[in-house]
Curated annotation (Swiss-Prot):
Listed name of the protein: Large ribosomal subunit protein bL28
Region (Disordered): 1-25
Keywords in alphabetical order: Ribonucleoprotein, Ribosomal protein
Signal sequence residues: none
Biological process according to GO: translation
Pfam families: Ribosomal_L28 (PF00830)
MF terms (GO), sorted A to Z: structural constituent of ribosome
Taxonomic superkingdom: Bacteria
GO cellular component assignments: cytosolic large ribosomal subunit
UniProt xrefs under Gene3D superfamilies: Ribosomal protein L28/L24
Alphabetized PANTHER family for the sequence: 39S RIBOSOMAL PROTEIN L28, MITOCHONDRIAL, LARGE RIBOSOMAL SUBUNIT PROTEIN BL28M
Family: Belongs to the bacterial ribosomal protein bL28 family.
Amino acid sequence: MARVCQVTGKAPMSGNNVSHANNKTKRRFLPNLQNRRFWVESENRWVRLRVSNAGLRLIDKNGIDSVLADLRARGEA
């Protein structure tokens, strides 16, 4: 399973660890993903999503029905 948020599309980025001596080594910045179940009242069922913390905040703000409608319009759910 890819480390990608199903709501926002956030994915890992690459960058550098930088030491005090300014030596740089490559690293990955991973999104803060959580596996969550959401109760969808209109469908009377649970929906599992792998979402980032930003995705959770979007769901809190807009509602799960709105977010699911956007996902289905994109063909992802």
